């Protein structure tokens, strides 16, 4: 399956039409990671976002020298999306949980897409805002549960 078709069938990109996925596919690169390999380290450069085609990715955060898995990302889902928006260092690490194939979108390529097809780029930002909002809501729920047990 080609990149544009994969994106078109991906529920995360359901708001994109064929023309949008065609444009987006031109700025995607396919990358492969072996199980256990680091995709990006915590505090590493925030220069790409990723969409999982196959495999899985563990998002980990180091707390007091202990690496904790905070999320497992599966095919069709994305991670590292804050890099497209702010370019800041990574807040967590990403490691392949299995042999994994991802599509990556670099910040530079996204900037080029914004210039070439601004409507598509705006739709992508809308998608990322929804994803980040959902993750923030979940983090708030998790904090509520933690604070209940601490009190």
Segments predicted by a language model, with ranges:
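Cytosolic regulatory regions built on CNB/CRP/Popeye-like sensor folds
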Residues: 1-151
